[in-house]
Amino acid sequence: MDKVDLLSLTMEEMESLFLEIGEKKFRAKQAFQWVNKGIKQYEEMTNLSKKLIKQLSEETRITHNRIEEKFVSKIDGTVKYLFLLDDGHIIEGVLMKYKHGFTACISTQVGCAMGCQFCASTTGGLIRNLRAGEMIDQILLMQQDQGERISNIVLMGSGEPLHNYDETIRFLKIVNDPEGLNIGNRHITLSTCGLVPEIKKLGALQIPINLAISLHAPNDQLRKQTMPIAQKYTIDQLIQSCYDYLENNNRRITFEYALIEDVNDGEKEAHELSKLLKGLLCHVNLIPINPIEERTYQKSKDSQVKKFQQILKSNGIEATIRREMGTDIQGACGQLRRKYVDDQEKKEISEV
């Protein structure tokens, strides 16, 4: 039986654990504070008794990711991390530096099962879900490495957060806790390819985070070409789930739209997208895709991206073009991990 990971526990769960072993609630609070500061050795919990430390070390564990590799963009200072997990798997995270502070883009799964054709994260399929502690530790390691506090989080790394629903919700509760990283919900963005039932469940929880929907097409026929999830849920169902979400959380929804040359970047698609989103409290984030070796899709021309944006704006839809960051270090989701895994496999074959 796996030991309980202290870094994956909410404050409430930590208190329940400590009550079960005959300890006071305030001891649970102390332990919660320690693990969310990034300590990895039980002996570092200096305000806990030696007896309790011994018991915890025997009956529990603390997630301990490691920075395997780090790449710093010479263009904009973006930092790309490869994290080594306890079981040897690799995940990636990105630290982006803005005037308003540091934003961490973290992974929620090892690989991804969603199969989106323009995303490198999914080329090897899903290997496993991450625990909440493995998500938290990505942030802790980035903070320790940079010596700076991270003020914003985006769940846009490898994996589909709502496909790992329970651990993602646990992560949100932990990271928002005043005794932990204390990052406000309004500084957290969750990106999903559109798991309709889970969007409704998330909305019902009334956690006021920012929701981003990976839409990438204005109609079902086009969306099915690049996103397998569209075979399961129609765009009408997805948009309705967004209206349902807004009933519980009056937070503007972002629709991510990756522009692919001669696929979804035409004037027709821009007008169709405008009609689809009319009246919805939303914003469109236009994303010039990064070319992926395993795929044949090409990035839209800058002039076409701007024309697409202008059409949306003229139709009353707020739209921005996402700033490209870390392009010289394979900063796009999944690219660096895929290259690392491929290189390791080639190395193993050459050593046989």
Swiss-Prot record:
One of its GO terms (molecular function) is rRNA (adenine(2503)-C2-)-methyltransferase activity. [4Fe-4S] cluster binds at residues 112, 116, 119. The keyword Signal does not apply. Disulfide bonds join 105-333. It catalyses: adenosine(2503) in 23S rRNA + 2 reduced [2Fe-2S]-[ferredoxin] + 2 S-adenosyl-L-methionine = 2-methyladenosine(2503) in 23S rRNA + 5'-deoxyadenosine + L-methionine + 2 oxidized [2Fe-2S]-[ferredoxin] + S-adenosyl-L-homocysteine; adenosine(37) in tRNA + 2 reduced [2Fe-2S]-[ferredoxin] + 2 S-adenosyl-L-methionine = 2-methyladenosine(37) in tRNA + 5'-deoxyadenosine + L-methionine + 2 oxidized [2Fe-2S]-[ferredoxin] + S-adenosyl-L-homocysteine. GO terms for cellular component: cytoplasm. Binds 1 [4Fe-4S] cluster. The cluster is coordinated with 3 cysteines and an exchangeable S-adenosyl-L-methionine. It comes from the Bacteria. Pfam families: Radical_SAM, RlmN_N. It is found in: Cytoplasm. S-adenosyl-L-methionine binds at residues 159-160, 191, 214-216, 290. Residues 98-328 form the Radical SAM core domain. Its cofactor is [4Fe-4S] cluster. Its main location: cytoplasm. Its EC number is 2.1.1.192. Belongs to the radical SAM superfamily. RlmN family. Specifically methylates position 2 of adenine 2503 in 23S rRNA and position 2 of adenine 37 in tRNAs. This is Probable dual-specificity RNA methyltransferase RlmN.
